[in-house]
Amino acid sequence: MAARNKARKRAFQILFEAEQRGVDPKTAMADWIRLARTDDRQPPVTEYTMQLVEGCEAHAERIDELLSSYSVGWSLDRMPVVDRNVLRLGTYELLWEDDVPDAVVLDEAVQLAKEFSTDESPAFVNGLLARLMELKPTLKR
C-alpha cells in the first residue's frame, strides 16, 4: 500500500474515532501517536496523516457547510458516520491539497467507502465529491 494511501486511511480512522469518542481530531491523533510509541504493532502517524487531520479540523466548518449544501436529500447528521468522515477527508484534500490530483482524491475516498461503509456508500461518496470537483473553481475556500 502506497504511503499516501496508508496516511489517508489512518487519517480517516482518526477522524472517525474522534467523532465516535466526542473529542477533537487532534486529541484522537495524539492518542494514536502515543500508542505508536509504546506498541510496535501500531503503525506510526506520518506527517501526511497529521497534515490531513489538522487540515480537516482547521477547515471543518467550511467542509461541513459544503457537504450540507451539496448532499441533496441528506443532512450531515443523517449520513453514516463513516461516510461523513470519508467525505470530510475527501473534501479537504480536494479543495486544500493542491498537489493531489482530483481523480486520486475521488478514487481514494471511494476505496475507503468500499472498505469501511455500506454497499451504497461508494456511489454516494463518488457522486458528492465529483459534484464538488466540478464546482471547485467557483467554491470559496
Regions found by a protein language model. Give the residues of each.
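N-terminal interaction/assembly modules
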Residues: M1-R141
